[in-house]
Amino acid sequence: MAIFGSLKDMSLPDVVGMLGRRSGVLEVFALPGRRQSFAIALEGGRVIWVKEGTKVLDPLQARSVLQELFRTQEGAFEFSAGTPSPPPEGQGLGWPLERLLLTMTTIEDEYHAYSTSLPDPKTRFRAVQTDIWLEEPLWSFWEKAKPFLSRSAGASAEELAQRLGLRDREVAYYLHKLRLAGKLAPVRAYEETLNERAPEKQGLVRRLLASLLGRTR
């Protein structure tokens, strides 16, 4: 038996909470500004995969979609009970629902807390540490964004959003978190720091050379 309704009457977190550990596919459709519907495969209290239309989303894109659906108050849903089809090999998520809902709630709270501190979408950042440990979902974002943030020119939220298929605001949030953790710096500030250190290094080299020359005389 299918369960269906409107997101105006019941939000996605409430729908998922109601479903509990049931297995099946939850379809969300008729979303404003979206042509495609989304499907979420649930099995025993875990998210198995997320699809946009017929495309299975990678973990970073899946989290982005779920975060968007988490806050939306428009659209409709329908849950069809049963065992969902398995995901393509290597693309299974296996996320516990309770932990996922807690993470999304935390991110939503941080969105509001950081709203006035998020960087401009055009500000470019560069990685200052590449060997780092991060918790999800920041780790998934870092793994996707690292090749662009490790370049000498760095990358902006605007550019990363286009390359990774995410929203500008979401990318700005991740960049802000990475900057707070000391993993990124704005490109201009990073270059200024290097320029400030250059004379110190040159002075040290001169002193070492002078010392060596003095010993040989």
Each PLM stretch: what is its role?
Residues M1-R217:
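Acidic, Ser/Thr/Pro-enriched low-complexity segments and adjacent helix/loop capping patches
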